[in-house]
């Protein structure tokens, strides 16, 4: 009779409750015997001594009471003493999949209590427990002189000493609390004791989460000194939990990092507060930060959401490796979705941490911003109609403030011709009105779209812009008998729109980070936000090509914007200068799952130079991998500042069966200087991972000097799914050097 069940990590001692009545049975009898509970008893021989009320089952005994299974060579049931004795290769199969073994088992007290000698158990995928003896008193199981290890042992290969083991003079498993306690616990590495604790505890496999200490970690840094992280996990309920993590350093003060998570049926929330006493510009002070995100349902159609990122100190995040962001964005919103309409009201707050940052009073607060969209279900003139109404109030303590109201209507009609041409006709109209209040004391802090200062006083500006678009695409598709597919698709978009549309006096609030690239070359309106309008007749032309074959693919794109007359709003470095834009290209080659190569090029038709060059390579070769990225931007876009060039590489090298090495580097090619480097070496097998990593940051951020860090990582594995997701080295060497993985 074959029986299988899923296993979970943890310790479980199982007592089989049987009530046997009956008479003599022949070999291989299968007899359902019952008094209060029906069970199945199978054995080679079953005898019943009616004078002493004793049942003896011998030879391949199997007892199944639908809750657990007992296997043994011999089972004796003394009904008067209410005692069950099992001998010879005793196996106890628990409902959760764990299996216990013993040489001898005695069960008493209505089979609730008992004793096991020569106790062993299989736990989860690979865990093993060995004890000289074990006893059970109700829900509490006590094992003496016990040892636990998840490591595979093999006498044939000579691996008889586990890589690591947890030994204890006494192990107590309280099934009512779902927790396992180890008394006088000693952790051994390769048979050598390395850690002692009077008591250790962890939850049993049936518990999804339970409060307790997570794996600590440590390291040393030239900026922080020696540091240690001591995370503690708090299980609030099935949908809420929290983590408190003290970070203790010898040179830069101490902080406490927290995390709170809660999941709803249709949403969730996350908060990460950080607070500590640390130095800044030569003075010690209390510093803090808060990150978070959430979406909280408050009805059938309404949600409240937020994104939080704020700090009290300019260098706090960088000093403790909390975040490398230098611009922090916060928003709070109220959203409703009903049918085919959506309403969104939000507010935004920004914080600038950059070196040479502007005064925080000059950074705007957006409150409120309103966005309403309606798409009727019925077709309008055969096409789809869309109405969008938005408004925004932008407030500054210093500098000009403004309010905007915009209404946009769009009609779209897609068509497919008999020969496969894809034609989409659309018409669009947008009207905007601004109320701008200039700051007479600071007239030049905010400029309009032409770069002119916003004058003092109250000004009203309006504009209306219609647009007609014809989008044409004709995909040519062919397939071969070898399993190859080819797609060639020419694209042409004709846009008819009047010139102008960007009058003076409109503050450039949300169109400063425009970038022409392969993601928007075939967009009829490339401008982000509502401040800047791409006006005038133009054509977006180009082609896409794709080839698919067994094991890989090749994709390519080329596109350009053509105009009969230059738009003066776009300068030399915009990519849209003159009557011909940059020629935007992209290709991607994939040989799955081994190699992926992507390159993006923007060619300047006026100078013949390359304005943008991006290359991304990923290769996987067994246990080794290589990632390289290169970017060069010669265009001085507003959001990017001066031209820059950078190369970033990361190599993971598998060496033999257990060893691996890691190296990563990032270099500023524009200024010929290194930014970050990291080197690491690690060893791991089926139950333990060890690594040491060296990190060097070459950049200075105010009083946070370039630093060198050494990180130590010890990852005990317990045979659970979490082990598969625990990296031996940090996933991102340069943004989260202190990232940790918790003990499952």
Where are these regions (language model features)?
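Bacterial N-terminal signal peptides
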Residues: 10-20
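Immediate N-terminus of the mature polypeptide
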Residues: 3, 27-28, 48, 225, ...
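N-terminal amphipathic/hydrophobic interface segments
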Residues: 25-146, 165-168, 172-173, 178-180, ...
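Outer-membrane beta-barrel proteins and related beta-barrel translocases across Gram-negative bacteria
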Residues: 104-106, 111-113, 121-142, 146-166, ...
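An N-terminal low-complexity intrinsically disordered segment enriched in acidic/polar residues
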Residues: 5, 19-23
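Short, Lys/Arg-rich amphipathic segments at extreme N-termini
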Residues: 18-19, 42-46, 470
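N-terminal secretory signal peptides that target proteins for export/translocation
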Residues: 1-7
């Amino acid at each position: 009779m074959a029986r299988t069940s899923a296993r979970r990590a943890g310790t479980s001692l199982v007592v089989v409750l049987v009530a046997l009545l009956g008479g003599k049975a022949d070999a291989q009898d299968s007899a359902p015997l019952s008094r209060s509970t029906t069970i199945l008893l199978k054995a080679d021989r079953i005898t019943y001594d009616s004078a002493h009320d004793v049942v003896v089952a011998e030879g391949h005994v199997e007892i199944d009471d639908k809750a657990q299974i007992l296997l043994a060579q011999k089972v004796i049931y003394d009904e008067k003493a209410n005692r069950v004795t099992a001998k010879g290769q005793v196996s106890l199969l628990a409902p959760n999949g764990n299996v216990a073994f013993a040489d001898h088992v005695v069960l008493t007290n209505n089979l609730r209590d008992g004793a096991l000698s020569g106790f062993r158990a299989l736990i989860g995928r690979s865990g093993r427990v060995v004890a000289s003896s074990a006893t059970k008193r109700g829900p509490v199981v006590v094992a003496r002189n016990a040892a636990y290890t998840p490591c595979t042992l093999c006498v044939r290969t000579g691996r008889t000493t586990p890589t690591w083991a947890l030994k204890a003079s006494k192990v107590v498993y309280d099934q009512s609390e779902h927790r396992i306690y180890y008394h006088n616990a000693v952790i051994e590495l390769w048979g050598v004791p390395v850690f002692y604790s009077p008591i250790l505890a962890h939850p049993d496999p049936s518990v999804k989460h339970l409060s307790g200490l997570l794996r600590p970690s440590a390291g040393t840094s030239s900026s922080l000194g020696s540091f240690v992280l001591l995370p503690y996990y708090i299980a609030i309920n099935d949908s809420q939990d929290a983590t408190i993590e003290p970070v203790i350093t010898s040179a830069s003060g101490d902080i406490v990092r927290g995390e709170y998570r809660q999941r709803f049926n249709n949403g969730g929330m996350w908060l990460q507060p950080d607070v500590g006493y640390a130095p800044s510009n030569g003075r010690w002070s209390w510093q803090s930060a808060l990150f978070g995100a959430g979406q909280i349902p408050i009805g059938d159609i309404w949600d409240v959401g937020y994104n939080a990122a704020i700090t009290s100190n300019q260098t706090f995040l960088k000093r403790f490796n909390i975040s490398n962001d230098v611009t922090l964005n916060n928003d709070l919103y109220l959203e409703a979705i009903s049918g085919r309409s959506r309403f969104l009201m939000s507010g935004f707050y920004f914080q600038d941490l950059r070196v040479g940052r502007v005064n925080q009073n000059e950074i705007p607060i957006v409150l409120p911003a309103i966005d309403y969209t309606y798409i009727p279900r019925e077709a309008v003139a055969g096409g789809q109609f869309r109405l969008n109404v938005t408004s925004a109030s932008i407030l500054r303590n210093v500098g000009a403030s403004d309010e905007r109201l915009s209404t946009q209507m769009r009609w779209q009609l897609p068509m497919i011709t008999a020969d496969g041409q894809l034609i989409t006709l659309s018409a669009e109209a947008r009207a905007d009105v601004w109320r701008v209040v200039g700051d007479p004391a600071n007239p030049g802090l905010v400029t309009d779209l032409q770069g002119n200062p916003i004058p003092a006083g109250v000004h009203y500006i309006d504009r209306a812009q219609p647009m007609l678009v014809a989008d044409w695409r004709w995909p040519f598709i062919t397939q071969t008998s070898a399993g190859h597919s080819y797609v060639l698709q020419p694209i042409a978009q004709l846009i008819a729109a009047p010139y102008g549309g960007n009058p003076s006096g409109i503050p450039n609030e949300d169109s400063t980070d425009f970038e022409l690239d392969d993601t928007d070359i075939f967009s009829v309106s490339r401008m982000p936000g509502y401040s800047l309008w791409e006006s005038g007749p133009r054509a977006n032309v180009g082609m896409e090509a794709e080839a698919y074959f067994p094991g890989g693919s090749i994709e390519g794109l080329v596109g350009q914007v053509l105009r009969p007359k230059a738009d003066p709003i776009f300068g030399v470095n915009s990519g849209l200068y003159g009557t011909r834009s940059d020629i935007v290209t992209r290709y991607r080659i994939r040989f799955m799952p081994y190699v992926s190569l992507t390159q993006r090029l923007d060619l300047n038709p006026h100078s013949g130079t390359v304005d943008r060059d991006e290359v991304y390579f990923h290769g996987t070769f067994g246990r080794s991998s290589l990632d390289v990225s290169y970017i060069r931007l010669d265009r001085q876009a507003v959001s990017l500042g001066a031209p820059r060039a950078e190369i970033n590489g990361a190599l993971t090298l598998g060496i033999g069966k257990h060893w691996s090495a890691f190296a990563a580097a990032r270099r500023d090619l524009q200024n010929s200087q290194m930014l970050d480097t990291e080197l690491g070496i690690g060893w791991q097998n089926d139950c333990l991972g060890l690594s040491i990593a060296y990190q060097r940051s070459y950049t200075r951020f105010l009083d946070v000097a370039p630093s060198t860090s050494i990180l130590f990582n010890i990852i005990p594995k317990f045979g659970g799914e979490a082990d598969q997701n625990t990296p031996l080295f940090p996933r991102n060497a340069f943004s989260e050097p202190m990232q940790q993985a918790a003990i499952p």
